[in-house]
Amino acid sequence: MQVPYLEFDNVSKSFPGVKALQNISFKCYEGKVHALMGENGAGKSTLLKILSGNYLPSEGKLSIGGRQLVFRNTKEALLAGVAIIYQELNIVPEMTVAENLCLGQLPHSFGIVDKAELIERTQQYLDKLDLNISPNTPLKELSIGQWQMIEIAKALSRGAKIIAFDEPTSSLSAPEIEKLFSVINELRDEGKVILYVSHRMEEIFRISDEITVLKDGQFVETFSDLSKITNDDLVRSMVGRNLGDIYHYRPREVGDVRLKIAHLSGEKLQGDFSLTVRAGEVLGLFGLVGAGRSELLKVIFGADPCVSGSIELDGKTLSIRSPKDAIEQGIVLCPEDRKKEGIVPTASVGENINISARRLHNFFKFIINDKWEKKNAEKQRQQMNVKTPSIEQLIVNLSGGNQQKAILGRWLSEDIKVLLLDEPTRGIDVGAKSEIYDLIFKLADQKLAIIVVSSDLPEVIGVSDRIMVMRAHQITGVVERADATEEKVLKLAMVESLNVGD
């Protein structure tokens, strides 16, 4: 019988007013990929932070190689052979590949870096991962996928036996994902212990040997024979309902045309786009990488310059030269890159909610109306069901789903008519996705015109009244909800001929 190499035994972690983990117990084995799944807020990140030495457990034991260990800091975890490859990669773009790989462990003699040994050591690990990259290349010249490979090389150079991946494919292209999986398979064959955190079911089934599910900081179950379970089994384990139940689509009466785009193009939008969205309608935009969906939303929102065409709102032609113009007309955007463009990471939940409407409620122009801000932030927090101990909490401490709900709450402080959602559920767990879908339908019931861009085909079919399909900055077709199938929509996303209707 195989002996576990890594074991969590009744591990708990508490923060003031919050029990993040309660009695988590499971085992991981050498030469296996052990997936960790659960909704945002289930406790996955907290568990990784205990494993990496960022947090001390409040209770429970952690055993590695049969030895009970307590990591008081990240250095102790590294010395024990633990490496975490976080979603936010720990790299210095201005430094070279070699300098990043050996950061903190630069070979030196009499205080002078031994460059020859630095290059030789780096090349050894680049060769191991079959990376055709020069050790002298600055990281800023490489792709995110290559950055991730450097992080893996760094882990191997430090003798890591346990390697945990936190949402590793969220920013990778298809070829980069294939490369990552190839490397993970090699590490498994070498007897490494791999922990793999992801929301992507197809990845989990493809790469994992075992799956442990957490919910609300508690252990639910471990699946050891993946041939006997389905997507629905996993979803039920995580959220207590079937996969098909998460959309909750309901038909509604739509009004007159609210948003009309005619022959629109922009500096980064190399096409000629015309579309309409009615009050109370959800229009889905689907297309493969490079289709131009995000570029279209940014031109409508004024984030990218409009070159030609017109935008009408309720029959009135608008002049939108900036996001400020769009917001003042009632058009708002929740951007694709939530962390870079959607939130202010150094600000609280309340400040992020109020950041747009603040100008309407301040005394004069520069004096903040604290009473209104606190009341509004709390109101939107409750309306959006943002899970946070307090509106004073830094927004970066929230899960992706709760960050997205806070961004939606920001716009509900405005008098909005058109809501543009770019990949609204990217990096969000199944339970939080269902809440976002409910919010979309609730806003549609209030007669907002809504455009949803999504790369998730079941999602775009599940939430939309109509689906407009794009390819290479052209509209290739429009499909009514009643006629929408994955095959039909995907075919339109891959054809070259233009075949459009409003």
From Swiss-Prot:
Pfam family for this entry, one: ABC_tran
GO molecular function: ABC-type L-arabinose transporter activity; ATP binding; ATP hydrolysis activity
Keywords: ATP-binding, Cell inner membrane, Cell membrane, Membrane, Nucleotide-binding, Repeat, Sugar transport, Translocase, Transport
Keyword Glycosyltransferase: no
Ranges of residues in domain ABC transporter: 6-241, 252-497
Enzyme Commission code: 7.5.2.12
UniProt membrane topology term: Peripheral membrane protein
Reactions listed under catalytic activity: L-arabinose(out) + ATP + H2O = L-arabinose(in) + ADP + phosphate + H(+)
Main location per the UniProt record: membrane
Domain of life assignment: Bacteria
Signal peptide feature range: none
Stored SMART domains: AAA
Keyword Chaperone among record annotations: no
GO cellular component, one term: plasma membrane
InterPro entries on file: AAA+_ATPase (IPR003593), ABC_carbohydrate_import_ATPase (IPR050107), ABC_transporter-like_ATP-bd (IPR003439), ABC_transporter-like_CS (IPR017871), P-loop_NTPase (IPR027417)
Subcellular location field: Cell inner membrane
Ligand binding (ATP): 38-45
Family affiliation: Belongs to the ABC transporter superfamily. Arabinose importer (TC 3.A.1.2.2) family.
Purpose: Part of the ABC transporter complex AraFGH involved in arabinose import. Responsible for energy coupling to the transport system.
Quaternary structure and partners: The complex is composed of two ATP-binding proteins (AraG), two transmembrane proteins (AraH) and a solute-binding protein (AraF).
Full protein name: Arabinose import ATP-binding protein AraG
Organism lineage string: Bacteria, Pseudomonadati, Pseudomonadota, Gammaproteobacteria, Pasteurellales
